[in-house]
């Protein structure tokens, strides 16, 4: 065996070991829902079955389609009846009513709000998303980010945690001075 062939064989062997060690498998090829926000980047835990991973990604897509459109008919297909918001802002109702109130209030301030999924990380029974929101308020551009963690069971979101860049949003809305 020539040195060149030996080197190629060893290189291929090392690549195969790395791929196996990283858990790269075909089952991470998830068919995304049409006409729903699509993640720009997605990482899926290789220990999940394709069915589990697909259900979790689809739940996230429907959830962010709700935030993107405000269509309340998505809620029953997206979250459980006893959905719980772990980072509920003061004054907002808990559960599915809280989601509706938040979206309605948001759309009063930024009627053309648009939600994009920048990154989606699917691990165990949780989905973590890095999101960007854009729109306009009184002809002024709005652009801020958020991070969500969703607990998914049987294809529906049971609870969430979220953190929005409220400083940037409030500055862009003119509620506080920009530095």
Regions found by a protein language model. Give the residues of each.
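Hydrophobic pocket/interface hotspot
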Residues: 60-63, 74-76, 83, 95, ...
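A solvent-exposed, acidic/Ser-Thr-rich amphipathic alpha-helical stretch
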Residues: 72-123
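Bacterial N-terminal signal peptides that target proteins for export
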Residues: 1-10
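Short, surface-exposed coil-to-beta transition loops
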Residues: 114-115, 142-147
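A short hydrophobic beta-strand element
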Residues: 124-133
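Short, low-complexity N-terminal intrinsically disordered segments enriched in polar/charged residues
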Residues: 23-73, 77, 178-179
């Amino acid at each position: 065996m020539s040195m060149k062939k030996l080197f190629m064989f060893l290189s291929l062997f090392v690549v195969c070991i790395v791929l196996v060690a990283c858990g790269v498998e075909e089952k991470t090829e998830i068919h995304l829902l049409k006409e729903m926000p699509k993640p720009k980047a997605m990482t899926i835990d290789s220990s999940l079955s394709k069915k589990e991973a697909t259900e979790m990604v689809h739940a996230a897509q429907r959830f962010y389609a709700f935030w993107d459109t405000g269509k309340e008919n998505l809620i029953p297909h997206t979250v459980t009846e006893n959905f719980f918001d772990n980072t509920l802002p003061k004054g907002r109702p808990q559960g599915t009513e809280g989601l509706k109130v938040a979206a309605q209030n948001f759309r009063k301030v930024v009627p053309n709000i648009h939600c994009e999924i920048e990154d989606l990380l699917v691990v165990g029974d949780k989905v973590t998303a890095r999101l960007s929101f854009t729109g306009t308020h009184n002809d002024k551009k709005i652009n801020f980010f958020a991070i969500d963690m969703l607990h998914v069971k049987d294809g529906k979101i049971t609870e969430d945690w979220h953190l929005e860049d409220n400083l940037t949003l409030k500055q862009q809305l003119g509620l506080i001075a920009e530095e």
